[in-house]
């Protein structure tokens, strides 16, 4: 197999030639024997529980099943490293090579790659300039296609023929005195026909011709020509050949990526890919045998079609025709199913890797937090900052080594919390909420240690994360290097991200829980029980009574207050009722105010009707404004 570079800039996916596929899996042993071709459908011998030679788990092709041990047991232990056993042909090496060593299957007949045939758009159909329906009829042995019309007047290149039409022309050709001259393979069927048509394409010449046609073409025809030219240009740019879309050699992925494990009852659980590969090998071997004994054409053709369907199911089960199902009528997972989708290799394992120094928990409101702070559970913090805590414990001489420090942390020694407090002081953490749709989906906060297991979040930053507190989860990441910490503090701190980068409008706005809390706090409940007129000399006295439980949050109270007063939305003040008192003092009473004035109209005292909730809200706002 070709050696891969240790350092590279990017991964490029392209078409592989049959020679390249064989190169991936082929190795030459010291005795000159070439191994790599999988020829048997067997997997593991049920008596010895060892992989069968030349089978899907062959140790000669893929490497030893046990570290430093050959198949026959002649060589064991690491001292025989690199030796190839002369008896069984297995190289003595680590078993992990079975995760990257590949094999291959030489197909007895070519088959089309289902991605290029049934993809949208179909690249094979685009390149051949044929309707997809016609290409499918040829591939699945329902129609012949003319690949060389010879001197026939009534035949054209790429014309489709039924079985009867093909036989009729064959009869005409061999009639006495017939002038019809056609080459031996003038019409073909199956993937061989598609391969022949693709081989005949001269990419450079075709591209030049298409460019000329595009200049004069209009409308739908022009769009079709441009689409075809784009595909041809891509083939030229990548140095790929069109006939490589038809497979003559099928790669077999490493056995440890399609494992077979023994269960408790002695039964085996296996990857679906092994069943799909087994179907391909069985049909391929049967086809090779039929060709060898020169079986009737109809039987050979049927076997070729079945081989095509088996390879289709292996690459992309269900893309065309009936889905191949296993036990319990469950569709088998093909190579495409393993790659694509949310649980596929790309999204699950490459884009969504597990990360060190990270945690995840449910978010709850942190009402006592500042905007740049988040509440980090102690249990999570000690795990995330463990290396920093261990370093500090050793530096202070509290413990002598890492093992003792870990033991101290596991035993929840009270000293570790003081050290942890010091470690997290000024060390920001990153909070991320999936899906991270814009820059503000991940922000930095200064952690504050809290009890419990939930991450506490300031409600003002919720709109940026599109978070609410109905069970949302967030991930915590610890920036380790000083550069990362500086970047988190300067660029990502929540207090530095007040405006939306998309619109420039403020994104730090009260929402959801804050709005609901403010509404509930200041709401006037008309159905609150009437507890009679309660009078308080000051706002503070009213709050003391509320704290002691003498009055409720929405109880109507009269409070002595000399500042301005605004009515809420929908609230109207009634006409004042005037009561004359001794000494010329007048008392004006409305449904919201009681004002006592002297003879000159100067206010002696004012009582307003409010609720403890509104007093709390007013006091909070006043305190912030005067701070």
Curated annotation (Swiss-Prot):
The EC number(s) this enzyme carries: 2.7.7.6
Pfam family, one: RNA_pol_Rpb1_2
Top-level taxonomic group: Bacteria
Gene Ontology biological process: DNA-templated transcription
Residues binding Zn(2+): 70, 72, 85, 88
InterPro entries named in the record: DNA-dir_RpoC1_gamma (IPR012755), DNA-dir_RpoC_beta_prime (IPR045867), RNA_pol_asu (IPR000722), RNA_pol_N (IPR006592), RNA_pol_Rpb1_1 (IPR007080), RNA_pol_Rpb1_3 (IPR007066), RNA_pol_Rpb1_3_sf (IPR042102), RNA_pol_Rpb1_clamp_domain (IPR044893)
Broadest EC class assigned to this enzyme: transferase
Gene3D superfamilies the record matches: 1.10.40.90, 2.40.40.20, RNA polymerase II, clamp domain, RNA polymerase Rpb1, domain 3
UniProt entry tagged with the keyword Nucleotidyltransferase: yes
GO terms, molecular function: DNA binding; DNA-directed RNA polymerase activity; magnesium ion binding; zinc ion binding
Needed cofactors: Mg(2+); Zn(2+)
Reaction(s) the record says it catalyses: RNA(n) + a ribonucleoside 5'-triphosphate = RNA(n+1) + diphosphate
Residues reported in the UniProt entry to bind Mg(2+): 468, 470, 472
Keywords: DNA-directed RNA polymerase, Magnesium, Metal-binding, Nucleotidyltransferase, Transcription, Transferase, Zinc
Gene Ontology CC: one annotated term: DNA-directed RNA polymerase complex
UniProt remark on cofactor binding: Binds 1 Mg(2+) ion per subunit.
Protein family membership: Belongs to the RNA polymerase beta' chain family. RpoC1 subfamily.
UniProt function note: DNA-dependent RNA polymerase catalyzes the transcription of DNA into RNA using the four ribonucleoside triphosphates as substrates.
NCBIfam families: PRK02625.1, rpoC1_cyan
Quaternary structure annotation from Swiss-Prot or TrEMBL: In cyanobacteria the RNAP catalytic core is composed of 2 alpha, 1 beta, 1 beta', 1 gamma and 1 omega subunit. When a sigma factor is associated with the core the holoenzyme is formed, which can initiate transcription.
The protein's name: DNA-directed RNA polymerase subunit gamma
Protein source organism: Synechococcus sp. (strain JA-2-3B'a(2-13))
